[in-house]
Amino acid sequence: MKIEAITGSEAEAFHRMGSQASHRYDEFVDLLVGAGIADGQTVVDLCCGSGELEVILSSRFPSLNLVGVDLSEDMVRIAREYAAEQGKALEFRHGDAQLLAGMEDLAGKADLVVSRNAFHRLTRLPAAFDTMLRLAKPGGAVLNCSFIHPSDFDESGFRAWVTFLNQRPWDSEMQIVWALAHHYAPRLDDYREALAQAARETPVSEQRVWIDDQGYGVPTVKCFARRAAA
């Protein structure tokens, strides 16, 4: 069982957690810097949730052209409201990361296409990576960070996961949601094959998939690729 859209009270709960723990985005922002993010670029965030990353990036890189896309209309609404509260004029759209529909105007134009802690919820992982690569311009990069199945953790990673699960300041419902997100998450090899499959349709000059716990405290999978130059 996988739920693609986060709606209602669950969407509100995810926003509360994200807005109260902005430091947990530091690692991902560092990865974006390593991928070459810079002012003036176009950046598309698939499965953007309630917009915390967009607010953070727009503060650090004021002239970014940011577009957040999420399947949940509730998340898009929350993201727009949150950005306005923070004094940010940001664009958020309703759309499915597994389809290019609604994002055709961005195809081949993004310097960087990103997604954070969301692809483990999707039912068509290769299609999501295909969307990322099709949105990227030639020479542009894609970067995804997602949960992995606990069977891919080593002993220290599993201990870190249990500690994180027990120590987060959330209610029992969100604790269960977070645990189930890992239970239904893809394996490391699933991510590798999904990215490789997408790269067969849209050629890349480099691709890499790895696991680490840098910054977040729990092992996550990182998937990076750069679309081949024209």
From Swiss-Prot:
Source domain of life: Bacteria
Keyword flag Methyltransferase: yes
Reaction equation(s) it catalyzes: 8-desmethylnovobiocic acid + S-adenosyl-L-methionine = novobiocic acid + S-adenosyl-L-homocysteine + H(+)
Biological role: C-methyltransferase that methylates 8-demethylnovobiocic acid to produce novobiocic acid in the novobiocin biosynthesis pathway. Novobiocin is an aminocoumarin family antibiotic that targets bacterial DNA gyrases.
Entry protein name: 8-demethylnovobiocic acid C(8)-methyltransferase
E.C. no: 2.1.1.284
Species classification: Bacteria, Bacillati, Actinomycetota, Actinomycetes, Kitasatosporales
Entry keyword Coiled coil: no
Keywords: Antibiotic biosynthesis, Methyltransferase, S-adenosyl-L-methionine, Transferase
TM ranges: none
Metabolic or biological pathway, per its Swiss-Prot or TrEMBL entry: Antibiotic biosynthesis; novobiocin biosynthesis
UniProt-recorded Gene Ontology molecular function terms: 8-demethylnovobiocic acid C8-methyltransferase activity; methyltransferase activity
Family: Belongs to the methyltransferase superfamily.
GO biological process, one term: novobiocin biosynthetic process
InterPro entries: Methyltransf_25, SAM-dependent_MTases_sf
Pfam families attached to this UniProt entry: Methyltransf_25
Disulfide bond annotation, renumbered to this chain: none
Gene source species: Streptomyces niveus (Streptomyces spheroides)
